[in-house]
Amino acid sequence: MSLNLADIRLEYSKKELSPEDCLPDAVAQFEIWLNEAIAAQVPEPTAMNLAAIGADGRPSSRIVLLKGVEDGQLLFYTNYQSRKGQALEANPYVALNFFWPELERQVRIEGKAARVAPEVSDAYFASRPYTSRLGAWASEQSREIASKATLVTRAAMFGARYPINVPRPPHWGGFAVVPDRVEFWQGRPSRLHDRVLYTLQPDGGWSRSRLAP
């Protein structure tokens, strides 16, 4: 079957963006855009594409949820034994992408990921719903399983083991991404999009520049 995709396109025209309109700090500017996405009721505004490269040199990507912005770092949580967890142990450099089509915007972030302190992971894990905490024990993430029944059986087993308080599994926790390159993209007519790039400087400040679309 052949698909005709050539004529599928939208014309973007909602807003403009220039380096002069942006805050000096890239993460502060990101928080403004994130809050605007939340206020606009964009579905899953914290969903981001996380791309990583494993020890085999192969890239992989998936959607994960941003769970915090603290001290200039972006936090997310996962199973450390999953494919992405193992990739980040082998190569900590990542690329993140947020796409908010309702606002005709995307944000591209590059940086280095590192595990957060255990107490930070403990605090977030304790805030999760009971069934989600059980799922962190039941799912041997990214490993092949015989059937869905295997997963259901494991969830029931851990539910019996932890009927009330579910401790955080040692193989589950957070990563914090320290960004060094952040690009803000605003869709514009005729594909003449606005792109503003922040680059981290040796003194900890950020430079801003406009990129060709």
UniProtKB/Swiss-Prot annotation:
UniProt keyword Flavoprotein present: yes
Record text on cofactor binding: Binds 1 FMN per subunit.
* Pathway annotation: Cofactor metabolism; pyridoxal 5'-phosphate salvage; pyridoxal 5'-phosphate from pyridoxamine 5'-phosphate: step 1/1; Cofactor metabolism; pyridoxal 5'-phosphate salvage; pyridoxal 5'-phosphate from pyridoxine 5'-phosphate: step 1/1
Q: Which residues bind FMN?
A: 62-67, 77-78, 83-84, 106, 141-142, 185, 195
Gene Ontology process terms (BP)? pyridoxine biosynthetic process
- Alphabetical UniProt keywords: Flavoprotein, FMN, Oxidoreductase, Pyridoxine biosynthesis
Q: Which GO terms describe its molecular function?
A: FMN binding; pyridoxamine phosphate oxidase activity
Cofactor(s) for this UniProt protein: FMN
Q: Which Gene3D superfamilies match?
A: Electron Transport, Fmn-binding Protein, Chain A
Q: Name one Pfam family in it.
A: PNP_phzG_C
Where substrate binds, per the record, is at 9-12, 67, 124, 128, 132, 191-193
Give the Enzyme Commission number.
1.4.3.5
For this protein, the record's HAMAP family field holds: PdxH
* NCBIfam families per the UniProt record, alphabetical: pdxH, PRK05679.1
Q: What does this protein do?
A: Catalyzes the oxidation of either pyridoxine 5'-phosphate (PNP) or pyridoxamine 5'-phosphate (PMP) into pyridoxal 5'-phosphate (PLP).
Assembly, per entry: Homodimer.
Supply the name of the protein.
Pyridoxine/pyridoxamine 5'-phosphate oxidase
Native source organism of the sequence = Chromobacterium violaceum (strain ATCC 12472 / DSM 30191 / JCM 1249 / CCUG 213 / NBRC 12614 / NCIMB 9131 / NCTC 9757 / MK)
